[in-house]
Amino acid sequence: MNFVRILSFVFALVLALGAVSAAPEPRWKLFKKIEKVGRNVRDGLIKAGPAIAVIGQAKSLGK
């Protein structure tokens, strides 16, 4: 009988500590990730712009 009381007390303690220490994650974190993906795409296009222009010029010379 004592074992069941101790086990239930430990379970309740773990449950209470888990509920208190679990801070809710902010909702805007998802939007920050989306913004980061968009920023990476934009930066990639800016860096690839000169290379695409050179390829376009090379194709026009080949015709």
Swiss-Prot record:
Indicate what this protein is called per its UniProt record. Cecropin-A
Which family would the database say this protein is a member of? Belongs to the cecropin family.
Q: Which PROSITE patterns match?
A: CECROPIN (PS00268)
Its biological purpose is as follows: Cecropins have lytic and antibacterial activity against several Gram-positive and Gram-negative bacteria.
Q: Which keywords, in A-to-Z order, does the entry hold?
A: Amidation, Antibiotic, Antimicrobial, Immunity, Innate immunity, Secreted, Signal
Sequence positions bearing Leucine amide: 61
- One Gene Ontology cellular component annotation held by this UniProt entry: extracellular region
Q: How would you summarize where this protein is expressed among tissues?
A: Highest expression in fat body and hemocytes. Is also expressed in Malpighian tubules and to a much lesser extent in midgut. Not present in silk gland.
* Gene Ontology BP terms: antibacterial humoral response; defense response to Gram-positive bacterium; innate immune response
Tell me the superkingdom of the source: Eukaryota
Propeptide residues, chain positions: 23-26
Gene giving rise to this polypeptide: CECA
Localization recorded for this chain is: Secreted
Q: Where is the signal peptide?
A: 1-22
Keyword Signal (UniProt) = yes
